Amino acid sequence: MPTFVDPSKCDGCKGGEKTACMYICPNDLMILDPEEMKAFNQEPEACWECYSCIKICPQGAITARPYADFAPMGGTCIPLRGSEDIMWTIKFRNGSVKRFKFPIRTTPEGSIKPFEGKPEAGDLENELLFTETALTVPQVALGQKAQIADAETSQCWFDLPCEGGNR
């Protein structure tokens, strides 16, 4: 569902150098027409369909044209974003309207602690990665030989010398 700008609603973010939709578009598709001072999607086929431009537009000038299997040709999708949820309004070409409301977040903002319980970063001399913990050799296995079928010599942990000269 690529996005389209309604020129009658777009005010070019009050004549600024960069509109909100230009700022937020990850694919740099939204541009400002310097003559009319209206934003538009320069390549709708390349739209990633993230709908960031729709959600950020202060005038509600950007809409998504839904795929035919979702809403028949001529329909539009319009979001209304609140602080806790987003409501999508689907206008069908016959005039009927349906609304769907979804939460924006399922966890309180700031409640996720991704590095909790992880070691402190900054030890560049450590051979372990940031998230790795040191692995130790099991005490039971130290000094015991591990028999490997069809091997010429037996192998053991490297803490003690192995018989047969292999290390």
Swiss-Prot record:
InterPro entries from the UniProt entry = 4Fe4S_Fe-S-bd, 4Fe4S_Fe_S_CS, AprB, AprB_C, APS_reduc_Bsu_C_sf, Fe-S_Ferredoxin
User: Where is the 4Fe-4S ferredoxin-type domain positioned along the sequence?
Assistant: 1-35, 38-67
Q: Which PANTHER family match?
A: ADENYLYLSULFATE REDUCTASE, BETA SUBUNIT, FERREDOXIN III
Binding of [4Fe-4S] cluster 2, residues: 25, 47, 50, 53
Give a GO molecular function annotation for the protein: protein heterodimerization activity
Q: Which Gene3D superfamilies did the record assign?
A: 3.30.70.20, Adenylylsulphate reductase, beta subunit, C-terminal domain
Q: Which domain of life is it from?
A: Bacteria
Gene designation? aprB
**Name used for this protein in its record:** Adenylylsulfate reductase subunit beta
Q: Name one GO biological process term.
A: dissimilatory sulfate reduction
Q: Which cofactor does it need?
A: [4Fe-4S] cluster
Entry cofactor note text?
A: Binds 2 [4Fe-4S] clusters.
Chain positions of site Important for interaction with AprA at the substrate channel entrance? 152, 159, 163
Organism whose genome encodes this protein = Megalodesulfovibrio gigas (strain ATCC 19364 / DSM 1382 / NCIMB 9332 / VKM B-1759)
Q: Does the keyword 4Fe-4S apply?
A: yes
Where do the annotations place [4Fe-4S] cluster 1 binding?
10, 13, 21, 57
Question: Where is the protein localized?
Answer: Cytoplasm
Q: What is its main location?
A: cytoplasm
How it assembles, according to the record, is:
Heterodimer composed of AprA and AprB. The heterodimers can dimerize to form heterotetramers.
Q: For the site Important for the electron transfer from the iron-sulfur cluster 1 to the FAD of AprA, which positions are given?
A: 48
Entry function: Iron-sulfur cluster subunit of the adenylylsulfate reductase which catalyzes reversibly the reduction of adenosine 5'-phosphosulfate (APS) to sulfite and AMP during dissimilatory sulfate reduction. The iron-sulfur cluster 2 is thought to accept electrons from a still unknown electron donor and transfer electrons to the iron-sulfur cluster 1 of this protein and then onto the FAD of AprA.
State the pH dependence.
Answer: Optimum pH is 7.4 for the adenylylsulfate reductase.
